[in-house]
Amino acid sequence: MPRRRVIGQRKILPDPKFGSELLAKFVNILMVDGKKSTAEAIVYTALETLAQRSGKDFLEAFEVALDNVRPTVEVKSRRVGGSTYQVPVEVRPVRRNALAMRWIVDAARKRGDKSMALRLANELSDAAENKGSAVKKREDVHRMAEANKAFAHYRW
């Protein structure tokens, strides 16, 4: 714990096109080497493609995809008497969003499609349909937490 004052979390400015803080955070996670305009162009193109496929609003389609990837529990290592246990803990709401976005971007980067915008659109549409690598990652994390439910009493 710091002895000085606790520094508050920085406020992220909303996305210029849709006015969404969630989308602005997503752009920041996708951004590489500080190239924000490139990241924004990729996200907007991907969202347009996603909206055309699903027939929904841009942000609504994005929200559905994000909802399907958000984890509710995860495991954290906890050392007790010489042995390390994987203890299941509930994920805070801010971390849920961050993990979901990170998993979607990582899964999109690993796909083999032509452009990053197309890869991202495909991953988001897969996530909206409850399939794809990002959803599999969430299910793996949930399965790990379920398997280690016996150690839940070590929570701190």
Curated annotation (Swiss-Prot):
SUPFAM superfamilies: Ribosomal protein S7. One of its GO terms (molecular function) is rRNA binding. Gene3D superfamilies: Ribosomal protein S7 domain. Coiled coil: none annotated. It holds the Pfam family Ribosomal_S7. It comes from the Bacteria. The keyword Chaperone does not apply. PROSITE patterns: RIBOSOMAL_S7. GO terms for biological process: ribosomal small subunit assembly; translation. Keywords: Ribonucleoprotein, Ribosomal protein, RNA-binding, rRNA-binding, tRNA-binding. The keyword Ribonucleoprotein applies. GO terms for cellular component: cytosolic small ribosomal subunit; ribosome. Part of the 30S ribosomal subunit. Contacts proteins S9 and S11. Belongs to the universal ribosomal protein uS7 family. One of the primary rRNA binding proteins, it binds directly to 16S rRNA where it nucleates assembly of the head domain of the 30S subunit. Is located at the subunit interface close to the decoding center, probably blocks exit of the E-site tRNA. This is Small ribosomal subunit protein uS7.
